[in-house]
Every structure is written in C-alpha cells, then in structure tokens.
Amino acid sequence: MKTILDVNNLFKSYGNNIAVNSVSFRVEQGQVFGLLGPNGSGKTTLLGCITGILLANQGSFSWFEGDEFTKARLRIGALIETPNFFPYLSAWKNLEIVAKIKGCEHSRIDRVLEEVQLLDRKNDEFKTFSLGMKQRLAIASALLNDPEVLVLDEPTNGLDPQGINEIRNIILQQKAKGKTIILASHLLNEVEKVCSDVVIIKKGEVLKSGKVEDILNSGKRLELAATDMDKLWISLSGMSGISNLQNRNGFIVAELNEDMNADFVNKSLQDSGISLNHLVLLKADLESEFLKLTQQ
C-alpha cells in the first residue's frame, strides 16, 4: 500500500514547553487516520508542522513517498482550526476568493458546495449560517483543489449532534471517493466511528497507535456474578491472565489478557466450586482504552 505521510521523531517546543515530543507514525493511502488526544495534547501543533504552517525543531516528515513539499501541498486540502470567511459575502463569493488563491477553476465551487450540502445556500451571506454550516463551508474550501488528502483539525468541535452527524457523513463520503483523511479530535466517539487507524497522544507523546479495530479487540473484559461474590472475587484475584478487577453495579468486571477466554475462566471457576449465574463478554470501546492510557 502506498505511503501518504511518513513522520519520524518530530519535535516542536515553545521555549521550555514541549508541544510535540518525538512523534512518529505512518499514514497509508485510503486510511481515515485519527489523532486522538485531550485538549492541549499537541494535535494542532502536529498538524501545523506537517502542513508547513509551523516549523518543527527536530525530526522530519515526507508526503507521498518523498515528493517535494511545495508540490505535495497542491495535493492536500487542510482545515486547521477556524477558517476566516467574510461575513457579508455569500458562500459562493467566499469560495471564489479561495479558488483564486488556490488557482482552482470556478466550476469546482458548485461541485464542492453540493458535496457539503450547501448548494441551495450558495447565495446566502456567511453571517446567516449556523455553526455547522460554517464548518461545512470550511470543508468545501479544503475540497476546492480536489485534494488526494484531507487534513481536518477538530472538524466537529462545538457542534450539536446533528452537525456532528453531517460532518461525519461528509468524511465517510470523501473516504468512499478514495481520499485519505487525517483527522484530529478529542472526541472518542468520532474517532471510533469514522477512523480506520489511530494514534493516541497525550502531552505531545504517542501513547499507543494502530488499527482502531485492533485496539478495541485488545481490551477484553468479562462481567461476572455468582451467589458468593466474595469467593468469586478471591478466585479471580488468584487466576493468572486476569487483572484490574472492579465492582460495578453488582457485578465483578475483570480484564483478560490476550491468551485468556471466557470458556477457560468459567471452567476454572467451576473446578473451584463456583457456579456463575452471570457471565458476559463486554465489548471493548475506545473510551476505556483511552482513559486507561491517559490516566497512567
């Protein structure tokens, strides 16, 4: 698979404050690649570095397997933080200005407005738009040059559920068209629903990276109950391959290592004279993995 972006030991600081600390990752063609981290984790700074807005102190990055950066930028559409539009100009007129700056044909304007479902509002002034519509117009501006890659920084920040869903659908539609998307977000649900791959960042450092599916499958947990809960707790505590026991809503929740499974646990407990009246394999979620990593 073709490598779209290769980041190697990127480091960026502001005086004594380290924003990005030796970050490395690789984005492959067709991925929706998530940068997940709490506010202040360095996501925006990292995106600023790889799009040429900021200059890193150390490390390197390359686009499209070593393509010259000035050429590579023409193949990238980026939305970093809040875009600036003229409030008294229409959506079409605002995009016309962006098209002139980017050297894009005006025929692209109606096309991208349709892609973000704003074609019927193209003659309305920007100041009349809702926050969600403003964000969709910003994505339209990033799509004007028909880029191979979209770089989006917190595209659903501050939006209501409907606005979030609209942006999510646009991202998935662009993925279906073959675009590679790099998405920075602090919203776990957003990354879990749209991203194929993720890097989890805290204080500028990578805590974990990989396929979202693999990260979800790595955190197997069991929810158990028996008539004698104290005896069950003691037995589970002494069982290898089980950790992080918790009492939750009248059940015991246990984390399993990769080699452990529910059938083995059930048989081992039966051999110890414990009959379970409740045994459920819990679906892992990105939130639990994220919280576990960021609280370490």
Give the positions of each predicted feature.
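ABC-family P-loop ATPase nucleotide-binding domain
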Residues: M1-F11, Q296
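Short coil/loop linkers at secondary-structure junctions
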Residues: E105, L119, I242-S243, S275
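ABC transporter nucleotide-binding domain
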Residues: R168-L256
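Short, surface-exposed acidic/glycine-rich loop or hinge patches that mediate macromolecular interfaces
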Residues: G66-D67, G103, T227, D259, ...
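Residue-level "edge-of-site" marker
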Residues: V112, F126, N249-G250, L282
